[in-house]
Amino acid sequence: MQKMRILLIALCLGTLCGQVSYGGAGDRILLLGDSMMASNRGSGQSVAAVIEAAVGQDVSDRSVAGARYFYNLPITGKLGLRLTEQYQKGQWNWVVLNGGGNDLLFGCGCSKCAKMLDRLVSKDGLRGAIPSFIANIRKTGAKVIYVGYLRNPGVQSPIKACKPAGDELDRRLTRMARGDAGITFLPMSDLVPSGDRTFHQSDLIHPSVKGSRGIGARIAHVIKK
């Protein structure tokens, strides 16, 4: 059993979790999320790197590819596959995050997702795993930027069917943000032009370097305002 635990931890650290950056004393921006945030980290061209370059502040990037809100395995969950476990206490000015897409993809196959959507965030934006997590972050005084997902460029891909659920998630997150001036919902639904594959990697799921640049630039614009 102990060997299995060690193997799982090594697997997570080596493949699933990627490089987790722990913030130093001067860090004031914390980034959480799934593969949309974690992509291109190995080449130093992730969303966090784009934000750092644009605003001139270090970003503590704790995003983990595959992260979900509803994830039951205890060890890998603690290592960040449970999205809420990525949060690290600190004197953060900003907490930037995304999430919910893997819950829709793996929890309900991006179809018949009414119950999963309600678990993530209610129609009025007041209840659910996401508003609860954000409320706890806001209690620390940090401002929150919740980032929406890139959309499929209009071609066949494994996540093309996720658009209706993704659109509804965006609507609910917009309502959530309206209730608190310290929360910004930042959609990415209009970032990818129709037919343009260059914002995605070859799998048409994860952002390319160009996609990460576009996401990071929008986030940096909000921070610099």
Summary of predicted features, one role per range:
Residues 80-224:
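Alpha-helical cap/lid subdomain in secreted, periplasmic
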Residues 18, 23-25:
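Boundary at the C-terminal end of the N-terminal hydrophobic targeting segment
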Residues 8-16:
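Bacterial N-terminal signal peptides
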Residues 26-31, 36-128:
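Conserved SGNH/GDSL esterase-like catalytic core that processes O-acyl groups on lipids
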Residues 1-8:
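Bacterial N-terminal signal peptides that target proteins for export
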